[in-house]
Amino acid sequence: IGERTAETIKIQIASASVEKAKEIESMNIRGRDLVTGLPKSIDINAEDVAKAIQEVVQNIIVAIKETLEETSPEIAADVIDHGIVLTGGGALLKNLPEVISDATKVPVFIAQDPLDCVAIGTGESLKNIEVMRKRR
């Protein structure tokens, strides 16, 4: 499959939770058979997709845990009080907030407008670059 089909799969049926993926419908995808080289259409189910991405989901959880372990006590207190905010396209992966929250015991939320908020925040930082430099 190509990148566009992979993105469609992620949006429509991918889940960070194998257990909850069982509740999601399957979908038909089209691509090229790697053995024959011919076009092929197959049905894939959400559980298989969830199993296929589990290593990536676990890597995200490990990275979050390592970051939390290295965080100052003051920031850790803020994280406990206010939670973790997910941004970017990956934040839209079904059940990701719940999976991360279960693993970290910290509330997890999806940012408002997760696809654009990083770019918007970067733009705001660039507008205030002198203030940012003084904070160092």
Where do the PLM segments sit?
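Glycine-rich phosphate-binding loops at beta-strand->alpha-helix junctions
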Residues: 14, 76-100
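Phosphate-binding glycine-rich/basic clefts of nucleotide- and phosphate-handling proteins
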Residues: 1-54
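Conserved phosphate-binding/catalytic loops in two-lobed NTP-binding clefts
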Residues: 98-124, 132-136
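Residue-level signature of catalytic and energy-coupling elements of molecular machines
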Residues: 64, 86, 122
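Charged, alpha-helix-enriched surfaces in structured cytosolic catalytic cores
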Residues: 1-4, 8, 44, 48, ...
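PAZ/PAZ-like end-binding module
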Residues: 35-40, 44-45, 64, 104, ...
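Short flexible coil/turn linkers enriched for glycine and charged/polar residues
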Residues: 21, 36, 80, 102-104
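Phosphate/ATP-binding catalytic cores across multiple sugar-kinase/actin-like superfamilies
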Residues: 52-79, 125-128
